[in-house]
Design a protein with these regions (language model features):
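Bacterial N-terminal signal peptides
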Residues: 12-21
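Extracytoplasmic ligand-binding site segments that recognize negatively charged/polar headgroups
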Residues: 56-68, 84-91, 106-270
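Extracytoplasmic/periplasmic substrate-binding proteins
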Residues: 260-322, 365-366
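Boundary at the C-terminal end of the N-terminal hydrophobic targeting segment
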Residues: 24-28
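Mature extracytoplasmic/periplasmic domains
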Residues: 314-383
Length: 405
């Protein structure tokens, strides 16, 4: 599942002028003198191709961003980017598995996917990905190699997917109603006990809800390292029970004093932000460090709202773009991904009035863009690595058995 984002502000006239200037001045594509023969061949092959891009479709702002990207790709390269909106990329994984089983090794229905975590691991392990390809991308040179881009939920990426953005599990609060926000899950429970009905989290398996469970477990368990090793059930059932026991004990206590006594949960991050703004909750939860700024810009939160992470750091992952092994438009997908890694496209994506997804490029990549896009100074919170994805389904299933009904 890919990180959803809250509703963001529409493009203002000022922002439109900045973006127009940005588009005119961006230099994301090498000049003809620096284009390699191999990449020129890719550009030639891509012209006229339609790239069917399977991506989460739950945010109008992200959908609008992809429409903009399609326009740019058509005008510059003759490539059409067609978003195929899905609720969960696991659906795409199953479709690709079916094509693999049927022996459909070319002319596939999917040309590009937005993935991370368990879906990447599944696609990689089942031979569903094309590549390695990242070394072919001219804009790969701009990527900030200090970010954890070489692993995806502990699974080595090996050039089979290109990083697109950064997600961190953070909280939003209003200083006027909560002057001293909790800095740990233990402190969060204490706050909930002091203010019954004011704390909640999205219902798993919604991405943010599951992320809340993983982050809590990483703090509470006595065997953190086990979470970074593959879990094999049923033989590891005793290990699973022992490692996760502190989480269920914690949630038993939290739900007693949670919003609706833990019998009802927000649908996702957008609802937690709305409940925070309505003063029904003291904290909202998001996987986008820019979400508060975006919600403020959109008028969905007080201007005093702040974002923060717990003292131990923030659960962190990168979300990626990949190409299936049987894609019908591999060249077009390579051109589309290269464009989405350009300073221009990354700066627009990071704009909190448009999407607000933090960039994965180094700050130096933006120096030739007009202000304010020439200063992309995203500074991530101290990061906590995602557990091995094999734990995910077991945690969600156990949560469902205990609390889902």
């Amino acid at each position: 599942m890919i990180t959803p984002f809250p509703a963001l502000k529409k493009l203002t006239l000022t922002a439109a002028l900045l973006i127009s200037s940005l588009s005119a001045n961006a230099n994301e594509t090498p000049t003809n003198a620096t284009i390699t023969p191999t990449w020129q061949q890719t550009l030639t092959q891509a012209k006229g191709e339609t790239v069917y891009f399977n991506a989460w479709g739950g945010s109008q702002e992200i959908n609008d961003y992809l429409l903009w990207a399609n326009t740019q790709l058509q005008q510059r390269y003759g490539v059409t980017l067609k978003q195929v909106k899905v609720t969960d990329i696991a659906e795409t994984t199953q479709r690709l598995l079916a094509e693999k089983t049927a022996g459909k090794n070319s002319g596939g229905s999917v040309d590009m996917v937005w993935i991370n975590g368990e879906n990447f691991r599944s696609m990689k392990r089942n031979g569903l990905l094309y590549g390695p390809f990242t070394h072919q991308l001219p804009n790969w040179k701009y990527v900030d190699k200090s970010l954890p881009i070489d692993k995806d939920f502990s699974e080595p990426t090996q050039g089979l997917e290109a990083p697109w953005g950064v997600g961190q599990l953070v909280f939003i609060y209003d200083p006027e109603t909560l002057s001293n926000p909790p800095k740990s899950f233990k402190a969060l429970l204490a706050l909930a006990q002091q203010h019954p009905g004011k704390i909640s989290y999205p219902k798993p398996p919604e991405f943010h809800g599951t992320s809340f469970l993983k982050a809590a477990l990483l703090e509470l368990t006595m065997d953190k390292q086990a979470l970074y090793q593959p879990l094999q059930l049923p033989q590891d059932q005793a290990l699973f029970n022992r490692v996760t026991a502190p989480l269920w004990h914690y949630l038993d206590q939290l739900h007693k004093v949670a919003w609706h006594q833990g019998k009802q949960f927000p649908a996702g991050t957008a609802e937690t932000i709305q409940l925070l703004d309505d003063q029904q909750l003291l904290l909202a939860i998001t996987f986008n460090p820019n979400a508060a700024a975006a919600a403020i810009a959109n008028g969905n939160l007080t201007e005093k709202a702040k974002t923060y992470a717990f003292s131990a750091g923030a659960l962190t992952n990168i979300h990626f773009l990949a190409i299936p092994w049987n894609a019908n438009a591999k060249a077009g997908a390579l051109v589309a991904i290269n464009f989405l890694l350009s300073p221009e496209a990354q700066a627009r994506k990071a704009d909190t009035s448009l999407w607000g997804d933090p960039t994965i490029l180094s700050p130096q990549a933006f120096t030739k863009l007009p202000a304010p896009y020439n200063q992309q100074n995203f500074k991530p919170y101290p990061s906590i690595a995602e557990p091995n994805p094999t734990w995910l389904a077991a945690i969600e299933q156990q949560w469902q058995q205990r609390y889902g009904n």
